[in-house]
Amino acid sequence: MVLSQLNGLTSPLDERHVHALQIALKGMTPTQLAWVSGYLAGIGGGPLRMPTEPKAVERITILFGSQTGNAKAVAEQLGARASEQGMDARVISMGDFNPRKLSKEQWVLIVVSTHGEGEPPENAYALHAFIQDQGAGRLEQLPFAVLGLGDSSYEHFCRTAVDFDRRLAELGAQRILPLQCCALDYRSDTERWSSDALNRLSALAPRKASNVVAMPTLRSHQDLRSHQEQSRNRARPYDKDNPYTATLLENRRITTLDAVSDVRHLALAIEPDAMHYRPGDALGVWVENDPSLADTILAGVGIDGAARIELGDEELDLRHALIERLELTQLHPTTVRGWSRASGRTGAEDAGERLEREEQTRIYLAGNDAFRLPDAGDTPLIMIGAGTGVAPYRAFLQQRAANGHPGRNWLIFGNRHFHRDFLYQLDWQAHRKAGRLDRVSLAFSRDGAEKPYVQQRLREEGKEILRWLDAGAHLYVCGATAMGQAVDHALVEIFTIEAGLDPDCASLRRYPARECYATDDL
């Protein structure tokens, strides 16, 4: 901006001051102007300020419900774009949001995933339950829009997003955009919805009023080019669309050869600064199809693998698409396999078996803020896992041992056979011997006629479970969706029978403060 432009703007300077500045600054070099700019800011005690309007700036609240981190990432990107456009936007986990304050919000955008059989993510459970309640208040003054993430192959595709969109409208809230449900390959849909939402809000909501007078930025063309080059070269964080290429150090089968499941323990070399993970996080792994299968398909249909095709917004050769981008059994885009840290996934044993030492694979970090160790190191832990769901607890105990945390630990683990499927058995024995594993309850369902499962062990240990919870224990559940539901039912029985609670209030999911209960589905 030049001084002649001040006359056309809202300015604290009258015509006399503008004229005086024009005379004083006439003929100054860029270096002299830069010095004067700093001098004026200094004697003013800080940035030169414009008068602001007394009315409060309207705020946009972006709420996310996320199980594996995808919805959180989309919400954060949306918030960053809103802020760049001058909007007063804040991004909040639904788990950190007080549902009773929903009616006081001015603009709400919801980004939420669905997991299990149409269930809300852990951090969305309380808000989801609150608005579904018959006593939820009216929300006539609340403009909103909902974006859902899910897997279209499931029966209850984006069920949680549908629930939020429907119920908010029933409560009188004003829908400013139609519900958008995004499948696994969601990037283009989320970007389009985000643009539509911000365009809509820009027409409805005022920008944050600036209280700083714009001053000219004095930079040479050379400096500007250098700055632009640095911006382009700035490292982009690794995510689903920009995966990190890791080197495989170890591929070890941790079930016996006669076990039903070929479960693999994979060790990957990751540069220390590439990603910062915590116990409870998962790795998203882009697993490639066997090149020989791709070649067989191409030979069978008589198509040259070098033929160029369009896949979404990208153009690539057909063979490359068959190996890296398409699910060969259905020819829809491949999806990321979510592997718990230090674990194999039973559903991906073929892919894990193909990986050889020193081979490379594409990964990204799928953070899970709902599945974390408690901050207090003396908090007792009850860790319930079935099959490969036991893997996060290996990381939990390693972290507690490294930190010297004294909290008691109880592992409840189930699988098919003791001798074939006791995953990480030597690790648990070492922790037990070192005094870091206070209790171990096991359930192997194929070793005898009894067929016990982890939920049966819970019922048998009901009184002790209550004692640990009364002492402040955090309870974790990791395994298949059906197993998690069975555990929840067992806990309801325990609280009903042992504690005398009403069944409608007995589940840990119904507690107002649910930090003591965390689940992670495989």
Curated annotation (Swiss-Prot):
Keyword Acyltransferase attributed: no
The protein's Enzyme Commission number: 1.8.1.2
GO molecular function: flavin adenine dinucleotide binding; FMN binding; sulfite reductase (NADPH) activity
Gene Ontology CC entries for this record: cytosol
Domain of life: Bacteria
Disulfide bonds: none
Catalytic activity: hydrogen sulfide + 3 NADP(+) + 3 H2O = sulfite + 3 NADPH + 4 H(+)
Basic and acidic residues compositional bias, start-end: 220-242
Enzyme class: oxidoreductase
Cofactor: FAD; FMN
Keywords assigned by UniProt, alphabetized: Amino-acid biosynthesis, Cysteine biosynthesis, Electron transport, FAD, Flavoprotein, FMN, NADP, Oxidoreductase, Transport
Region (Disordered) location: 217-242
Record-level GO BP terms: cysteine biosynthetic process
One Pfam family this sequence matches: FAD_binding_1
Domain FAD-binding FR-type: 241-399
Cofactor-binding details, from the entry: Binds 1 FAD per subunit.
Domain Flavodoxin-like: 60-198
PANTHER family named in the record: NADPH OXIDOREDUCTASE A (PTHR19384:SF128), NITRIC OXIDE SYNTHASE-RELATED (PTHR19384)
Protein role: Catalyzes the 6-electron reduction of sulfite to sulfide. This is one of several activities required for the biosynthesis of L-cysteine from sulfate. The flavo-protein component catalyzes the electron flow from NADPH -> FAD -> FMN to the hemoprotein component.
Quaternary organization: Alpha(8)-beta(8). The alpha component is a flavoprotein, the beta component is a hemoprotein.
Name the record gives this protein: Sulfite reductase [NADPH] flavoprotein alpha-component
Gene that encodes the chain: cysJ
